[in-house]
Design a protein with these regions (language model features):
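Short aromatic-glycine-(Arg/Gly/Cys) micro-motifs in beta-strand/loop hairpins
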Residues: 10-42
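Glycine-rich, flexible loop segments associated with nucleotide phosphate handling
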Residues: 7-13, 74-76
Length: 88
């Protein structure tokens, strides 16, 4: 990666819902078209919210839709970084 020039870097704050009840980190993934939830170990696949308020709404909707109060979901802040690079 010696021949790469960084042109632009951007960071965004996002929020995911996660739990470690199973003994390993799991993140909530929701299909937008349906009321269908699943858990994933891959944080890049997790559903991300643009604000903590929206993440709280997602958490409340999950509990209301599924009745699951034992997953112990928490809101996790996440910084996502992007770099635009030029290959020299």
């Amino acid at each position: 990666m010696d021949n790469i020039e960084k042109i632009l870097e951007k960071q965004e704050l996002r929020y995911v819902l996660g739990t470690a009840v199973s003994g390993k980190p799991m993140y909530l993934k929701k299909k937008l078209q349906k009321i269908e939830y699943s858990f994933t170990t891959n944080i890049t696949d997790a559903t991300k919210a643009h604000s903590s308020k929206i993440a709280r709404m997602m958490l409340n909707n999950y509990i209301q839709d599924t009745g699951d109060t034992e997953s112990e979901l928490v809101i996790i802040p996440l910084v996502i970084s992007y770099e635009l690079v030029k290959i020299l």
